[in-house]
Amino acid sequence: MQVLHVCSEMFPLLKTGGLADVIGALPAAQIADGVDARVLLPAFPDIRRGVTDAQVVSRRDTFAGHITLLFGHYNRVGIYLIDAPHLYDRPGSPYHDTNLFAYTDNVLRFALLGWVGAEMASGLDPFWRPDVVHAHDWHAGLAPAYLAARGRPAKSVFTVHNLAYQGMFYAHHMNDIQLPWSFFNIHGLEFNGQISFLKAGLYYADHITAVSPTYTREITEPQFAYGMEGLLQQRHREGRLSGVLNGVDEKIWSPETDLLLASRYTRDTLEDKAENKRQLQIAMGLKVDDKVPLFAVVSRLTSQKGLDLVLEALPGLLEQGGQLALLGAGDPVLQEGFLAAAAEYPGQVGVQIGYHEAFSHRIMGGADVILVPSRFEPCGLTQLYGLKYGTLPLVRRTGGLADTVSDCSLENLADGVASGFVFEDSNAWSLLRAIRRAFVLWSRPSLWRFVQRQAMAMDFSWQVAAKSYRELYYRLK
């Protein structure tokens, strides 16, 4: 079974979000599972520099200009690169300029990505062609459409990492992207009078996956579907929509081997986690005290992530004696709010604006509770890292958060399945009630340690996801 992942980023070469983490880990897990998985990416500068052994496979003149297809390896995974400097050789973000405006030629930049993905199934590399083209998010959404236009030389899977991003472009660009105008209708890639790369993936793929079972159900409902509910309900009825939970890359995220921690530990040596907490308190300007629970946030600061709820509930958390360490950036109003809280509550609130991968490891190793109060969350990786590190997640019951964290209710504690704290309603009162329950458990150290061990024993490895995808691919054949 030969599978080509078509996507726009890959950790650690280039990362703007969780998609990169998935592509950085899933193909390697699939190779270990017996699938010949490779990755197709635009040759953005950071990616091109990282694939040092790239060799020319093919050269083509396309609707988007001349391209060179390269092939090399990164971490023993085969990587195809679309080398088109006029489209991809730009500094900074792969999607927008330094003023945060989307590049005006994004329609060509990402149509080309989908086109090359489909051409791979028609022999663009004469020595390797995929049985399945697996496209990820709107950037690769046209790949299934190009495959359909070519008579489907390979099966296609389209994975939704976040349905909110739809890849919308003006209709006249149908003249530019080498797809038949007949594809531009409601039973195709048209959405609200425009081209939607996301809808193209949803409509033309042989199978759709979303990144958690609960999110898969949610996206068939108007609240979460952004107008796509009719199509997704139809795909669900046809048996062409399913959920595969993302995993954790244990080579990068493991407290036993994490060299970014001051003190490494396992579920059997949890006492060694205390030094990480002490170092984190020092680094964030917090009072060094192992008797108080240290809550943490590592997140984009947006209302989607529920960080306004954290700000509203913060006085209640601090009144009970807790501390907060925050690492993130985003909405300027939220940034200012957290910075003001740090100034008002020195020693109890520490804030670092920005994102630093290494420091996120130190927070995960040192905190007691990781807050993930998202209004919606397709899968979420932060709570999985928390589970792995014995940093109990406090989450809202939505998407992948609902699938991965079991509340510390009396019943779950008795059954030995409790792994964190879960609240229902997207408001500060509901969040604060969950925070209070965290304090109650904190007051019983032996029970807290028991739940930590339960959390750290859970298996969210990529091997589980790789097996699920392999079974899906074979069903499509």
Curated annotation (Swiss-Prot):
ADP-alpha-D-glucose binds at residue 15. Gene3D superfamilies: Glycogen Phosphorylase B. The keyword Nucleotidyltransferase does not apply. The keyword Transcription does not apply. GO terms for molecular function: alpha-1,4-glucan glucosyltransferase (ADP-glucose donor) activity; alpha-1,4-glucan glucosyltransferase (UDP-glucose donor) activity. One of its GO terms (biological process) is glycogen biosynthetic process. Its EC number is 2.4.1.21. It holds the Pfam family Glycos_transf_1. One of its GO terms (cellular component) is cytosol. It catalyses: [(1->4)-alpha-D-glucosyl](n) + ADP-alpha-D-glucose = [(1->4)-alpha-D-glucosyl](n+1) + ADP + H(+). It is an enzyme of class 2 (transferase). It comes from the Bacteria. InterPro entries: Glyco_trans_1 (IPR001296), GS/SS (IPR011835), Starch_synth_cat_dom (IPR013534). Keywords: Glycogen biosynthesis, Glycosyltransferase, Transferase. Synthesizes alpha-1,4-glucan chains using ADP-glucose. Belongs to the glycosyltransferase 1 family. Bacterial/plant glycogen synthase subfamily. This is Glycogen synthase. It comes from Shigella boydii serotype 18 (strain CDC 3083-94 / BS512). The lineage of its organism: Bacteria, Pseudomonadati, Pseudomonadota, Gammaproteobacteria, Enterobacterales. The gene is glgA.
